[in-house]
Amino acid sequence: MKKKILGLLGVFLAIWVSLPQGVFAASFQIDFDTACAAIQLINLDTGTVVYEKNPDERREPASTTKIMTYIVVYENVADPDNTKVTISEKIRDELLGTGSSLSGIQVGDVLSVTRLLHCMMIPSGNDAALALADFVGGGDVQKFVDMMNEKAEELGCTGTHFANPHGLHDDEHYTTARDLAIITQYAMMIPGFMDVCNTRSEYYTVEGGPAAGEQRLLVTTNRMIHPNLDPQYYYQYAQGIKTGSHDQAGYCLVSSAQKNGMSYLCVALGAPSVDEAGNRITEHREYNDTISLY
């Protein structure tokens, strides 16, 4: 397991160090207003920061948190395809009344770690994130969260602190657009990560427990990659990665795209999700900002 972690980290650091000097300065001026509170757009081929807005402002990341959750699970489970997790009542009970996005897993389900990663990333299941954290933490979710913070520090993040594995509101749960870009670039090197993040929908079969054999459907929350969710936000060049939202965080989106032979990563945090009266804003300007920047 240590070899697995050190290998990935070594590749990440080698790529980071090899980027040309001076590439980190923003080099592109835009002629339109952006709604998100914090943004960073990076050319992944050169490492150039193409555009940024408040990149070091602390923001709640909502469910984009799950990018780090994925990393920590991957690095601490040797055989995720064959490692099974039984969903306990405490997972269900802890999320009651939180307004969580759920993947539909049920108490008693026996699922592989790989399946739970899909349940966490595709429909943004807080239930799956919590189940994974509880399992990897040996029944101690806080231990898992500590591992998330240790990983953030290891990657060089300076404005990040996690308080949970799913992204629900907590005053001590925050990151920056710059840090989240670092975290995401690391995650993108994990084998299979981008395949999961770019999945529009998939069926799976419950492996064990009372519902063994039942087929269930997972559908992405990412409007950029699924033309049938909300066509106005579909972007043909997009390739994942993760959405997130709650009232305190606003609408958040971490995405990647390939266009004109170049690869890009955009972190967009804090688009307005409620108005001054507390009414839900239906326009997703995190998508508008991101597509306009691409």
Predicted regions located by residue number:
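Sec-dependent N-terminal signal peptides of Gram-positive bacterial secreted proteins and lipoproteins
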Residues: K2-A25
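Domain-terminus/edge residues, biased toward the C-terminal soluble/receptor-binding domains
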Residues: C157-T158, D171-Y174, R178-Y294
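Ubiquitous "structural anchor" signal
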Residues: I15-S18, V77-A78, C252
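Active-site-adjacent loops and short helices of periplasmic peptidoglycan-processing enzymes
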Residues: V23-R178, A187-P191
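A general lysine-centric signal
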Residues: K3-K4, K53, K66, K242
